[in-house]
Amino acid sequence: MTGYEARLITFGTWMYSVNKEQLARAGFYAIGQEDKVQCFHCGGGLANWKPKEDPWEQHAKWYPGCKYLLEEKGHEYINNIHLTRSLEGALVQTTKKTPSLTKRISDTIFPNPMLQEAIRMGFDFKDVKKIMEERIQTSGSNYKTLEVLVADLVSAQKDTTENELNQTSLQREISPEEPLRRLQEEKLCKICMDRHIAVVFIPCGHLVTCKQCAEAVDRCPMCSAVIDFKQRVFMS
């Protein structure tokens, strides 16, 4: 699947919203399961495409460590995708705050080097900013170590996911299949899109792959951080 034409053939009579030529150029080929595609180089899988989504942008968003992506688009493109996405989310939130609170955030959070470090690891700007705000409000000071910040971010992401699942469960009368679909997607390996996630990467804390796919990588497919240790977990 290293060749563009070979990848393009796999799409056959592709009937989904994203252009198959763009998908093939971005390194993806169809795996024959609805609109699921997979990168020939990094093995990263994507599905549930929305109209007007850019395959290159989605590739950079979810698998920034892919060498094919890096060769074709470069580090600057990947960094811009993540930075633009983070700043767009932050702009809406910041404009809603009072001037005094905005100044306090700028003075205590934006100069903190751990803010950029967390973003480079794949965390969303607004999530990092929010958790730093909460830290300042409860303890009077910002984070001192990146390890503690990452641990709190991972914990917050887990709580958010559980809350979202609980909220969708209350909407079963409106859409009975939606909560189950989202739960299944949350638990799927982001590389093979087939088996359940089962390994946490240390130190970045991402839980995105099954045991088999985790054995084949030495960098986190989510944030491209070097993996020091792989911790097996068992999902209920």
Swiss-Prot record:
The residue spans of each BIR repeat are 7-70
Q: Name one GO molecular function term.
A: cysteine-type endopeptidase inhibitor activity involved in apoptotic process
The record places its RING-type zinc fingers at: 189-224
> What SMART domains does UniProt report for this protein, alphabetically?
BIR, RING
Q: Name one GO cellular component term.
A: nucleus
- How does the annotation summarize its subunit structure? Binds to caspase-9.
Q: What is the lineage of its organism?
A: Eukaryota, Metazoa, Chordata, Craniata, Vertebrata
Q: Corresponding gene? A: BIRC8
Is Metal-binding a UniProt keyword of this protein?
A: yes
Member of which family?
Belongs to the IAP family.
Gene3D superfamilies hit by this protein: Death Domain, Fas, DNA helicase RuvA subunit, C-terminal domain, Inhibitor Of Apoptosis Protein (2mihbC-IAP-1), Chain A
Provide the protein name: Baculoviral IAP repeat-containing protein 8
PANTHER family named in the record: BACULOVIRAL IAP REPEAT-CONTAINING PROTEIN 8, INHIBITOR OF APOPTOSIS
Keywords attached to this Swiss-Prot or TrEMBL record, sorted alphabetically, are: Apoptosis, Cytoplasm, Metal-binding, Zinc, Zinc-finger
What is its subcellular localisation?
Cytoplasm
